[in-house]
Design a protein with these regions (language model features):
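An anionic, turn-rich surface loop/hairpin at beta-sheet edges
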Residues: 81-82
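Cleavable N-terminal signal peptides
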Residues: 9-10, 20
Length: 124
């Protein structure tokens, strides 16, 4: 599987996945808008700070759905789950809007400003 093919699959997955989860669960949209959750370079959603049990359960559920989607796409494409998850993470961070949280490559949480987010140098 070529890197270009992996990127195309992951981009499609990220675009559908992020939008679908945000529309399905108002609690997710509210937590994202409040800066309580954010996108991570590994393709999974993270809790900013400790969060409460309900928020951690929400994030865990979304991440289970993401892993299932990454696994399905990986099996169909010949890529690894980790490759698809990482590429999706790159795309999901790029798709954040100003005011939303994301994790930088050094592990710190940042709030997206008007400019481009800081992403892993391997992101295309």
């Amino acid at each position: 599987m070529t890197k270009k093919a992996i990127l195309m699959i992951a981009a499609a997955l990220a675009a559908v996945s992020g939008a679908a989860w945000a529309q399905r669960d108002p609690a997710y949209a509210a937590a994202r808008a409040a800066g309580e959750v954010g996108e991570q370079p590994d393709g999974y959603l993270g809790v900013v700070g400790g969060g409460n049990a309900q928020l951690r359960a929400l994030v865990s559920n979304i991440n289970i759905q993401r892993k299932a989607a990454y696994t399905q796409k990986a099996q169909a494409s010949g890529a690894t789950v980790e490759q698809l998850a990482f590429t999706s993470g790159c795309n999901l961070i790029a798709q954040t809007k100003p005011g939303e949280k994301y994790r930088t490559p050094d592990g710190s949480w940042e709030t997206r400003g008007a400019g481009a987010p800081v992403r892993d140098s391997r992101c295309v």
